[in-house]
Amino acid sequence: MTVNIYDNANEMASVLKETEQYTAWQNAFNAIQADEEAKQLFTKFQSVQVAVQQMMQSQQQPSADQEKEWDAIAADVQKNELITALLSTEQALNTLLTEINDIVTKPVADAYAKLRQK
């Protein structure tokens, strides 16, 4: 019997959409999409995250003005209940995805564990 692992992966993607974690995340995401202020703030927050990540990768330090701007955006994000709900549900969804990844990659992890034991 031939197994098409991609069929299984696509089925898992469909099943994922039925989980409590995904449903909660989707609802939180939709709430932000429906609120223009939250949507703009979240977009700005994502831009800041990318900028910070790029600076870290290139080992640059942000200017004092950049730090002030980023801190202000982070403070606004923490005050916005729609965004904090999205971030919370995203964390729960990521936990589930990490657990699934651990299950899927267990044969590889077990093989390396056996290699270390010898």
From Swiss-Prot:
A Pfam family this chain is assigned to: Com_YlbF
Using the chain's own numbering, where are the disulfide bonds? none
Q: Which domain of life is it from?
A: Bacteria
What the entry lists under InterPro entries is as follows: Com_YlbF (IPR010368), YheA/YmcA-like_dom_sf (IPR023378)
What family does this chain come from, according to its entry?
Answer: Belongs to the UPF0342 family.
Report the protein name in the record.
UPF0342 protein LCK_01004
- Source organism per entry reads Leuconostoc citreum (strain KM20)
